Amino acid sequence: MKQTFLRLALTFALLLSALPPAPLDAANPPDPRFGAVESYMAPDLAADLRVGWDRMIIHWYTRQPDNADQWITPPEETDRIKIATAAGREVVALLMGTPAWATDGPGGGGVPRGLYLPANDPGNLWARFVRRIVGENKGAITHWIIWNEPDIALEDYGAQYAGTVEDYYQLLKVAYVVAKEVNPNAVIHLGGLTYWHDLVYNRPSYLRRLLDVAVKDKTAKAHNYYFDIFTAHIYFRTETVFNIVAIYRKILREYGLSKPIWLNETNAAPNDDPQYPAGPLIPVTMDGQASFIIQANALALAVGAERIAVYKFIDDTPSGYEPYGLFRVDHSARPAAEAYRLVTSHFTNLKRVMYSQQPNYYLVTLTRRGAVTRVAWARAGQEVTLRLPATPGTKAAVYDKFGKTYPLAADRKGFYSLTLPAAPCDKSGECYVGGSPWVLVETY
């Protein structure tokens, strides 16, 4: 009976997710800075939260499972792209997953056979795949991410690419050359890097190792070093969002490069969801996850990230797996969903960012079209009281992380007073996420 009920519930959820979202308000489209991975799984909810971009994985082994003559386009993939585009969400594709027949290595992550042949050689199987997939989606998909987390070494848990750094550079190079031939407007992203795998295993930064390979290639400079956008994945610790992006930008500059940086995955999965009892080991609650969503987006903007995406929009696994979604598999919302709504409502139409890091708090000021948004939170286990000058000629409202509005008035000297709640910290004093943020919005 329980299994029958679960099947019915999942079927109903899938039917709901297949419904077309509300029509796009052409005068007020979603802000493309703010995305959510796999929001196509629940397009109605994505439209409601005003998700601006989506990431969709296209597995090579799904297109050509058995041989090079196959080409299978899943019909649901085409529908997802159309629905997202109609709702104002840009779809960004991630290419990965070597078919077993196309590699001498492990299926899924092996180095494609013929990778070092010229890109126009029929024996270069990866080039043939990229040429066809980019051509098929010309006009629908412009941004292409080349593989996922290549910095996880083959011997480490979670490895997704079995090649060397040199092999990944060649994978990137071939994809760049072929994609630009098919669609000159194609934008090639470096596969998202985790940062921590190099740090934990005491390896030099993967980005540095990759660029060391690139600078030896005499053709690289003329081709933008074969990638247009750098991609990072950052989880759990709020403050590392700013710090890690800054580290990667510094490395790029050391090699004379200035690339846009996207934060394609960020989140802090909670460990206290009763529907997902086997939660992560890092002590972040659902309340803390909501704080993280606001803080991570604010810090990413402060450090100059061009786009940010939450991983992920909705869970696609039952209880017992890490609960990253803003929504559970049954479409019920975690508190983080309303925090995300606050971001897509009051962090948009950005013109300028100012950032203040103090020993006990953060303050990020977003100057927007027609408004000023200030985001503040405590860094440590003590509450902090702030006095912030009111912006002349504006009306103010202050929001908690769930979007609830509270009364706020400036004092006689024209200052607002905010008390920032203490950050939740463990027994060792480690504060993974800052205290509950306040979002002060002044409108002209």
Question: Would you name each region that the model predicts?
Answer:
Residues 1-9:
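Bacterial N-terminal signal peptides that target proteins for export
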Residues 164-294, 303:
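Noncatalytic carbohydrate-binding groove/subsite architecture in carbohydrate-active enzymes
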Residues 26-59:
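Boundary/entry segment of secreted carbohydrate-active catalytic domains
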Residues 49-226:
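Substrate-binding cleft and catalytic face of glycoside hydrolase catalytic domains
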Residues 268-341, 355-360, 369:
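Aromatic/acidic polysaccharide-binding cleft in carbohydrate-active enzymes
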Residues 409-444:
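C-terminal beta-strand-rich structural cap/linker in extracellular carbohydrate-active enzymes
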Residues 8-18:
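Bacterial N-terminal signal peptides
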